[in-house]
A protein has these predicted regions:
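Acidic, proline-/serine-/threonine-rich low-complexity intrinsically disordered repeat tracts
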Residues: 16-29
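Single conserved hydrophobic/aromatic residue that forms the stacking wall/gate
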Residues: 1-15
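A short acidic, leucine-rich amphipathic alpha-helix
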Residues: 75-79, 169-173
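Terminal recognition/anchoring or ligand-binding modules at protein termini
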Residues: 178-182, 197-198
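Charged low-complexity interaction tracts in eukaryotic proteins
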Residues: 27-51, 90-145, 188-213
Length: 213
């Protein structure tokens, strides 16, 4: 399959992108609901101690169960904040990364970006996508969107229009996920998802227009 395990890429980014107000919700467009902060469990120094391993693993599983598929960068932020870590550095990211193998989760990667899934989900059979709600934390950075999820959102739009020029599909998919403008990261994330959609055989490009197969 396209997704494969790849631990060589640092997908954590501080390049925050402002999201637009969400589009009107559709029954097939569930809102992305973030994991609720459960309280401080220790200090930033405690986060890196072996004694915190069990608590970190439990939080990994809880966050992934709520938000998966979730990028390793966003997962690390959700987990690390319980130890007062306000900014996820490569050290904190590696801390979570190092415990993933011990957690009951699935791990995939696309173009070097690692995403974590609940054990009950089958990535290649995943057909859902989630849009931002009113909670600020439900508005994900573009690099935290799983390409498979973006592909599903793009397909949802194509099924309404039958076909769209590539540029229009990129723009409308970005809008669906709450982005008012196409910055570099947003554009890249949308195009990556559309590429996954076409690779999956559910759509094709013909003369600059993407058509549902």
């Amino acid at each position: 399959t396209r997704c494969s395990r790849d631990w060589s890429s640092d997908v954590c980014s501080s390049d925050l992108l402002k999201a637009a107000p969400p589009p009107p919700q559709q029954p097939s467009s569930p809102v992305y609901i973030p994991f609720a902060f459960t309280g401080i469990k220790g200090t930033p120094d405690d986060f890196h101690l072996p004694t915190a391993n069990s608590a970190i693993i439990a939080l990994i599983e809880a966050v992934v169960s709520k938000e998966g598929p979730i990028s390793i960068g966003l997962l690390s932020r959700r987990v690390a904040e319980h130890w007062g870590v306000s900014r996820v550095t490569s050290r904190a990211l590696n801390r979570v990364d190092g415990l993933l193998r011990r957690a009951n989760v699935k791990i995939t990667a696309d173009d070097g970006k690692v995403f974590i899934w609940p054990p009950s989900q089958v990535p290649k059979e995943y057909t859902d996508f989630r849009v931002p709600g009113q909670d600020e934390l439900s508005k994900r950075d573009a690099e935290d969107l799983c390409p498979i999820e973006v592909a599903n959102g793009a397909l949802y739009l194509l099924e309404q229009h039958v076909s769209l020029p590539v540029a229009d599909l990129v723009r409308e998919t970005a809008r669906l996920f709450g982005y008012a403008r196409l910055g570099q990261n947003v554009d890249k994330a949308m195009k990556s998802g559309i590429e996954v959609l076409m690779w999956s055989g559910r759509a094709k490009e013909d003369g600059g227009v993407v058509v549902v197969r």
